[in-house]
């Protein structure tokens, strides 16, 4: 899977509810269920060009929502920071010998895992 495909599905996770019903249906068939444009066209009884146009409008809408709201970018930044914190905790676990400090570190690690399963 390429990065554009994954990014588009991530945008859909955040903003899919903002698409029209038809855009959502075609997007899901294409991206999530791996149907071709021709297969979608046959199943929905619309032209292949109509499927293509609807899919492109859905993609443009998702990109527009991200440009204006930035939720995916913010989510990715948070996940990256959580990963850095986890790595730091692992280093501290390896070096720290004080049981009280280790207990606190374990509590912090559990809370981080709840944020980033």
UniProtKB/Swiss-Prot annotation:
<comment type="function">
    <text>Might take part in the signal recognition particle (SRP) pathway. This is inferred from the conservation of its genetic proximity to ftsY/ffh. May be a regulatory protein.</text>
</comment>
<comment type="similarity">
    <text>Belongs to the UPF0122 family.</text>
</comment>
<dbReference type="InterPro" id="IPR013324">
    <property type="entry name" value="RNA_pol_sigma_r3/r4-like"/>
</dbReference>
<dbReference type="InterPro" id="IPR036388">
    <property type="entry name" value="WH-like_DNA-bd_sf"/>
</dbReference>
<dbReference type="InterPro" id="IPR054831">
    <property type="entry name" value="UPF0122_fam_protein"/>
</dbReference>
<protein>
    <recommendedName>
        <fullName>UPF0122 protein Teth39_1278</fullName>
    </recommendedName>
</protein>
<dbReference type="Pfam" id="PF04297">
    <property type="entry name" value="UPF0122"/>
</dbReference>
<dbReference type="InterPro" id="IPR007394">
    <property type="entry name" value="UPF0122"/>
</dbReference>
């Amino acid at each position: 899977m390429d990065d554009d495909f994954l990014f588009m599905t991530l945008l859909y996770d955040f903003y899919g509810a903002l698409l029209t019903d038809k855009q959502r249906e075609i997007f899901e068939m294409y991206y999530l269920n791996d149907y071709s444009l021709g297969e979608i066209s046959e199943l929905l009884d619309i032209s292949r060009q109509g499927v293509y146009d609807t899919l492109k409008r859905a993609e443009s809408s998702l990109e527009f929502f991200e440009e204006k709201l930035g939720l995916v970018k913010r989510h990715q930044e948070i996940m990256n920071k959580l990963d850095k914190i986890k790595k730091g905790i692992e280093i501290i676990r390896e070096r720290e010998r004080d049981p009280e400090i280790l207990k606190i570190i374990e509590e912090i690690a559990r809370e981080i895992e709840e944020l980033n399963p």
